[in-house]
Design a protein with these regions (language model features):
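Chalcogenol-based redox active-site neighborhoods
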Residues: 1-154
């Protein structure tokens, strides 16, 4: 993937606040197993809700392969908290307001589109911080969780 993170690349550690405002690091999640990081453009929009709810609905399948799910968007901590409460998410939503982490992963759009400046992409990351799979689909919201599970052997 040009200008971003691709399969086989090693991901740098990062820290962002979760929906409670607590700072969370990628390395913290990786200590417990592989991590599925999914980027979504904007909380509480139709597509992002469908994508995020599918990750929620597959909690048992992700647990069976020892993987954790982490959602990231440019929404504020407060908006992430409301999104999580409304849909009962059982995984953290990280707030990347300045788009720094999105840019590091290569999912930040070139055009300034506000909250929609982030591409909908998913990265499956092994405990060695190496990317095992990348999923990119703007239209098939279920593809992200489904393909991530396949990459993890689920």
């Amino acid at each position: 993937m040009v200008g971003g993170v691709g399969v086989g690349d090693v991901v740098e550690d990062f820290e962002l606040p979760d929906e409670t405002g607590a700072p969370r690091r990628l390395s913290e999640f990786l200590a417990a197993g592989p991590v599925v990081v999914f980027f979504y453009p904007a909380a509480m929009t139709r597509g992002c809700t469908a994508q995020s709810c599918h990750f929620r609905d597959l909690a048992a399948e992700f647990a069976a392969v020892g993987a954790q799910r982490v959602g990231i968007s440019r929404d504020s901590v407060g908006r992430q908290a409301a999104f999580s409460r409304r849909h009962g998410f059982d995984y953290p939503l990280l707030s990347d307001v300045d788009g720094r982490v999105a840019a590091a992963f290569g999912v930040r759009r070139r055009l300034p589109l506000g909250a929609l400046s982030t591409r909908r992409m998913t990265f499956v990351i092994g405990q060695d911080r190496r990317v095992l799979a990348v999923v990119h689909s703007e239209l098939d919201m279920n593809a992200h969780a489904d393909q991530a599970l396949r990459a993890l052997g689920g």
